[in-house]
Amino acid sequence: MVSIAFYGGIPGGISTPITQQSEKSKCEENTMFQPYCYNNDSKNSMAESKEARDQEMNLKEESKEEKRRNDWWKIGMFLLCLAGTTGGILWWYEGLPQQHYIGLVAIGGRLNGSGQSNAIECWGSFPGCRPFQNYFSYETNRSIHMNNNTATLLEAYHREITFIYKSSCTDSDHCQEYQCKKVNLNSSDSSNSVRVEDVTNTAEYWGFKWLECNQTENFKTILVPENEMVNINDTDTWIPKGCNETWARVKRCPIDILYGIHPIRLCVQPPFFLVQEKGIADTSRIGNCGPTIFLGVLEDNKGVVRGDYTACNVRRLNINRKDYTGMYQVPIFYTCTFTNITSCNSEPIISVIMYETNQVQYLLCNNNNSNNYNCVVQSFGVIGQAHLELPRPNKRIRNQSFNQYNCSINNKTELETWKLVNTSGITPLPISSEANTGLIRHKRDFGISAIVAAIVAATAIARSATMSYVALTEVNKIMEVQNHTFEVENSTLNGMDLIERQIKILYAMILQTHADVQLLKERQQVEETFNLIGCIERTHVFCHTGHPWNMSWGHLNESTQWDDWVSKMEDLNQEILTTLHGARNNLAQSMITFNTPDSIAQFGKDLWSHIGNWIPGLGASIIKYIVMFLLIYLLLTSSPKILRALWKVTSGAGSSGGRYLKKKFHHKHASREDTWDQAQHNIHLAGVTGGSGDKYYKQKYSRNDWNGESEEYNRRPKSWVKSIEAFGESYISEKTKGEISQPGAAINEHKNGSGGNNPHQGSLDLEIRSEGGNIYDCCIKAQEGTLAIPCCGFPLWLFWGLVIIVGRIAGYGLRGLAVIIRICIRGLNLIFEIIRKMLDYIGRALNPGTSHVSMPQYV
């Protein structure tokens, strides 16, 4: 170091040496006492000496903590937010009415996926179709009685026993379209062989013209008389006769006795008539009165005859057909002798029901001469409520085995007000989703509505409790929790089964009651009719006597059966209450088991599995995929900020929130150390300079304009210098001297986490640990203005997700509006600029700067 001294004289003053030093020397001389080194390169550098090793360790620690941020936590939080928002969307979607589902009550299955356009479905074990043994489908043109936009159970169920109404008795196997072609039957007189030939102009054989009809579905070809079929629009399509005619139900007819079918099921066609059994040995007289059998409603030119070998004989013929595949059904020919037949409208063709003890033949007969008829067995016998293929002589009725059909109303228009709610499988009974449409419940329902509501509530509580508390379950208790959950669900399912059984019994009771009422109504109508008529025609064998016709009109229900039903309902009520009690106990045990918190990722995983189970109940919906795509997009765009904030909140003392608090504590105490060092420096100056510290600071601050802590002291009154002079020595203790010699030691101790000598430091560490480690406290506390949402449960997550979505959508809308406004402004500016340039160009053209027009000069 080079030092040059100039000794000069100041008039009246003291000779002062003037030295020239380097910047480094000036900085080193003041390092011991000044808290900051005031050079132009680093005015704000702290006086405390930080070791490079500590800085490296801090950097390494921060890099390690950054690497410790596991991806599973982010995935769990993302799935949790997605599941919460998706659950809200699904909750809203499941409550919407589905217009394409029409029905009253679907027990045992849904109407979804049914191949029929039906409003009511019945199954073989469902007593709603009681007392039928065989179920038939039919259509109806009769409108259901509506009262205030509501249909009662019996009217909607459409089982008015013995009620006469217009309908089309439709059988799914036979009353359908057939592809038919006209054929001729040719036979030689010497043999019983008949050939089937395809011709255009047909001729009669056995008194009828013939059709060869094909049923493609069953690979069956039927040879039938043309009188049995009805052509549709002059095409090759034919349907059996009677498919679109008026029918009514009656009590007794021969088919009841022979087939053993329940008496309130059959329907036949008008007008009423009676038939007499075999009279003379060789012939049977057919008339429209007689005491033996009450048949009910048949078409004109139809009669009933008891089968006898003297009345009708089978004519055995061999039908030869060239080529055919599958089954070829040929008719059975009879020759019959009937006497005293009066044909309506003098028609030659009549219909005759020929019955025996073990079989029935429905004959179509043509009168060839006086009492002789050529008859053929009809392929489509119009008997009962459906069109059945009647048995052949070699196909006798032994065990009364019939085709089974499902009963349904295939008419959407008359029950279009009924709708089913598409549920996720939780609700036991689907109900109407609209006001003023629903089942009318009365007191006789035995509290079924309350029981159903209890089952629904128990199921909803079980599922919601399972999904909510699974987030607070320890890993080692998951299996136990699932067992309790399964027990709750099993109890709920058992309760649903019991309710289903109650509903079956209830429907049977209501339908039987309705049947009894209708029997009484019809009996009253018949008695009123007989009071007007007296006796039927001239026979006087069937007259009104005022006594009930017991066997014809059926039997009323006995009280013992009704009492048995009531007792069963009471037993089921007790079983349901027991089942609900067990479900409640299992649910309480599940709540007791869920007593400790678990990871958020496990909650997200379990909740996502529940959502995945709910999604199939929605069906194929494009709205579902659009909503899920938008949710995923919004969450992906907003997840970084959410995850960053949640990371600071929930990661504990080692999280960024803890580090932030530590840094705040460090800077705060560093500030205190700097202030204390400055005060000690002032004490030293006061002791050395004798009160000239103020002048010294003024000179220093005039040369160095730094904004440190000393400015605060400069603004204070100058009296503090004297107080420091007087009491400065009391501040300088052994500990103070040690801290002056090593100003960074206390700070390093705080950094190392000792904090034993500072009570404030210890309390702060405790506060950090309590805020970082306790999950329950994060619901009511906040760190840096961020609410700890993840531990507040599913409802808060759902609300937060919806708020985020609404905010994002509003943000996108506002940004889009800003873009539109910016584009409009640019367009307007462009238009104005074009107009300005055009006007400027026109103005320049009209007013050029230099005139090229020379004016004429006159001399």
From Swiss-Prot:
<feature type="glycosylation site" description="N-linked (GlcNAc...) asparagine; by host">
    <location>
        <position position="148"/>
    </location>
</feature>
<feature type="region of interest" description="Immunosuppression">
    <location>
        <begin position="498"/>
        <end position="513"/>
    </location>
</feature>
<feature type="glycosylation site" description="N-linked (GlcNAc...) asparagine; by host">
    <location>
        <position position="490"/>
    </location>
</feature>
<keyword id="KW-1160">Virus entry into host cell</keyword>
<keyword id="KW-0261">Viral envelope protein</keyword>
<comment type="function">
    <text>The surface protein (SU) attaches the virus to the host cell by binding to its receptor. This interaction triggers the refolding of the transmembrane protein (TM) and is thought to activate its fusogenic potential by unmasking its fusion peptide. Fusion occurs at the host cell plasma membrane.</text>
</comment>
<protein>
    <recommendedName>
        <fullName>Envelope glycoprotein</fullName>
    </recommendedName>
</protein>
<feature type="topological domain" description="Cytoplasmic">
    <location>
        <begin position="636"/>
        <end position="859"/>
    </location>
</feature>
<keyword id="KW-1161">Viral attachment to host cell</keyword>
<keyword id="KW-0945">Host-virus interaction</keyword>
<dbReference type="GO" id="GO:0055036">
    <property type="term" value="C:virion membrane"/>
</dbReference>
<feature type="glycosylation site" description="N-linked (GlcNAc...) asparagine; by host">
    <location>
        <position position="483"/>
    </location>
</feature>
<feature type="glycosylation site" description="N-linked (GlcNAc...) asparagine; by host">
    <location>
        <position position="244"/>
    </location>
</feature>
<feature type="topological domain" description="Extracellular">
    <location>
        <begin position="7"/>
        <end position="614"/>
    </location>
</feature>
<comment type="subunit">
    <text>The mature envelope protein (Env) consists of a trimer of SU-TM heterodimers attached by noncovalent interactions or by a labile interchain disulfide bond.</text>
</comment>
<feature type="propeptide">
    <location>
        <begin position="1"/>
        <end position="6"/>
    </location>
</feature>
<feature type="coiled-coil region">
    <location>
        <begin position="663"/>
        <end position="699"/>
    </location>
</feature>
<feature type="glycosylation site" description="N-linked (GlcNAc...) asparagine; by host">
    <location>
        <position position="40"/>
    </location>
</feature>
<keyword id="KW-1133">Transmembrane helix</keyword>
<feature type="glycosylation site" description="N-linked (GlcNAc...) asparagine; by host">
    <location>
        <position position="557"/>
    </location>
</feature>
<feature type="coiled-coil region">
    <location>
        <begin position="576"/>
        <end position="624"/>
    </location>
</feature>
<feature type="glycosylation site" description="N-linked (GlcNAc...) asparagine; by host">
    <location>
        <position position="406"/>
    </location>
</feature>
<feature type="glycosylation site" description="N-linked (GlcNAc...) asparagine; by host">
    <location>
        <position position="368"/>
    </location>
</feature>
<feature type="site" description="Cleavage; by host">
    <location>
        <begin position="444"/>
        <end position="445"/>
    </location>
</feature>
<feature type="glycosylation site" description="N-linked (GlcNAc...) asparagine; by host">
    <location>
        <position position="411"/>
    </location>
</feature>
<keyword id="KW-1015">Disulfide bond</keyword>
<feature type="glycosylation site" description="N-linked (GlcNAc...) asparagine; by host">
    <location>
        <position position="550"/>
    </location>
</feature>
<feature type="glycosylation site" description="N-linked (GlcNAc...) asparagine; by host">
    <location>
        <position position="340"/>
    </location>
</feature>
<comment type="function">
    <text>The transmembrane protein (TM) acts as a class I viral fusion protein. Under the current model, the protein has at least 3 conformational states: pre-fusion native state, pre-hairpin intermediate state, and post-fusion hairpin state. During viral and target cell membrane fusion, the coiled coil regions (heptad repeats) assume a trimer-of-hairpins structure, positioning the fusion peptide in close proximity to the C-terminal region of the ectodomain. The formation of this structure appears to drive apposition and subsequent fusion of viral and target cell membranes.</text>
</comment>
<feature type="glycosylation site" description="N-linked (GlcNAc...) asparagine; by host">
    <location>
        <position position="112"/>
    </location>
</feature>
<feature type="region of interest" description="Fusion peptide">
    <location>
        <begin position="446"/>
        <end position="466"/>
    </location>
</feature>
<feature type="glycosylation site" description="N-linked (GlcNAc...) asparagine; by host">
    <location>
        <position position="422"/>
    </location>
</feature>
<feature type="site" description="Cleavage">
    <location>
        <begin position="684"/>
        <end position="685"/>
    </location>
</feature>
<feature type="glycosylation site" description="N-linked (GlcNAc...) asparagine; by host">
    <location>
        <position position="186"/>
    </location>
</feature>
<dbReference type="InterPro" id="IPR000328">
    <property type="entry name" value="GP41-like"/>
</dbReference>
<dbReference type="GO" id="GO:0019062">
    <property type="term" value="P:virion attachment to host cell"/>
</dbReference>
<keyword id="KW-0175">Coiled coil</keyword>
<dbReference type="GO" id="GO:0019031">
    <property type="term" value="C:viral envelope"/>
</dbReference>
<keyword id="KW-0165">Cleavage on pair of basic residues</keyword>
<dbReference type="GO" id="GO:0020002">
    <property type="term" value="C:host cell plasma membrane"/>
</dbReference>
<feature type="transmembrane region" description="Helical">
    <location>
        <begin position="615"/>
        <end position="635"/>
    </location>
</feature>
<dbReference type="InterPro" id="IPR001361">
    <property type="entry name" value="Gp90_EIAV"/>
</dbReference>
